[in-house]
A protein has these predicted regions:
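Hydrophobic cores of alpha-helical transmembrane segments in multi-pass inner/ER membrane proteins
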Residues: 15-21, 109-118, 177-189
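Small-polar-interrupted transmembrane alpha-helices in polytopic inner-membrane proteins
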Residues: 44-48, 78-91
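Interfacial aromatic-anchored transmembrane helix boundaries in multi-pass membrane proteins
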Residues: 52-61, 84-115
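Short helix-perturbing small/polar motifs within transmembrane alpha-helices
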Residues: 105-150
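C-terminal transmembrane helix-loop-helix hairpin of multi-pass membrane proteins
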Residues: 134-143, 157, 161-221
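Hydrophobic transmembrane alpha-helices
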Residues: 1-69
Length: 221
């Protein structure tokens, strides 16, 4: 969906996308810890592969995005990670465009950053069910917000794209549901086997080893 081809978006929208993406990448690279480079590479590669299976919808396409999951794990580093994935898709497979790369990155990265913030808020509860449910919501919102941003990009680029903009949003409803389940499951697994991959903003790790069961069988931390 975020793979809008060249020649579709108007120049003012292109310029805005380029400026904001460059700023986001610069900040993301500044935040990148060398220790996290392998993790970043794996998620960027996962994003690259997931989006290769796609179906055309008007001037864009329908496919998995995983930007909610990427945002949860990487935070600001998600911006350069998504940019690299999109660039390789455009160069190797002609999926999307080069000139429009800034807009495509913006449409995916902004929801990813919002999902990261939402997930960090949920972690203050220290309750696994709330955290996992929030992760699922982030999977849904990551796709939904990207659909809205893509539709907005098309709408600001000409009235002829108005109908396509509406179609983009509705066509991704199944993807939203799929990514809800996938993201929740992925975060639940990470919390159990590798919680250090999900550090809080204060650098503290959430461990669920001390989850206990109360008399009613309900889990609490």
């Amino acid at each position: 969906m975020a793979h809008i081809p060249d020649g579709v978006i108007s120049w003012p929208v292109l310029a805005g996308g380029i400026v904001t993406t460059l700023a986001g990448c610069a900040f993301g690279l500044k935040k990148l810890d060398p220790v996290a480079i392998p993790r970043t590479a794996v998620l960027s590669a996962t994003f690259f592969v997931a989006a290769l299976v796609h179906f055309p919808v008007g001037p864009t396409s329908v496919h998995l995005m995983l930007n909610g999951l990427i945002g949860i794990v990487l935070g600001w580093v998600a911006v350069p990670a998504i940019l690299v994935g999109l660039l390789l898709q455009a160069l190797l497979f002609g999926f999307g465009g080069i000139i429009v790369l800034g807009v495509n990155t913006f449409n995916l990265a902004v929801p990813a950053l919002l999902c990261h913030g939402l997930f960090q808020l949920s972690r203050r509860s220290q309750h696994p069910k709330i955290i996992i449910a929030t992760a699922g919501a982030c999977g849904f919102l990551g796709v939904g917000l990207t659909a809205v941003l893509v539709a907005t990009s098309l709408a600001f680029s000409g009235k002829e794209f108005a109908s396509a903009a509406q179609l983009v949003v509705f066509a991704h409803l199944p993807i939203m549901l799929i990514e809800t389940v996938f993201t929740a499951a992925a975060i639940a697994l990470l919390l159990r086997v590798k919680p250090e991959a999900l550090e809080t903003d204060q650098g503290q790790e959430l461990h669920l080893d001390h989850v206990q069961e109360d008399a009613q069988g309900k889990a609490y931390v």
